[in-house]
Amino acid sequence: MAIITAAQAKAYIPTLSASSSTDDALLVTLTSRFDAVAAAHLGYVRQSAGAFSIESGTYIEYLDGPGGRELHLSAKPVTAIGSIYDDPDAEYTSDELIASADYTLYGIEGLVMLDTTGADTYFSTAHRAIKATYTAGYS
């Protein structure tokens, strides 16, 4: 799904006819290119599909363990967390999966905060210890 449809773009460009489909392909191309440029400018990482986009999509990030209770994800707003692993050995087995009940997501900020009452109360500090799979972007 595009950030804006060809019909919506035509409503803002008075010289284009709303009933004509001649410019639709061009508008779709321009919209998708703008989406990629905007996402790169805003610091988004590539989605799992390989493209830069501010549209909602799946992200898989391998992050250095920040230590402490806070994990900052690159793409925002985060709308769902698929999984978060904290594994200094970078194997990301089920034993290293952080239970969703053990953290709180602040989606607009892209912040994951470990709860003090969970099994995991601090992130490790190893290189690429964190594997986060999540959905972020605008729909």
Task: Identify the meaning behind each predicted range.
Residues M1-S139:
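Divalent metal-cofactor coordination and adjacent catalytic microenvironments
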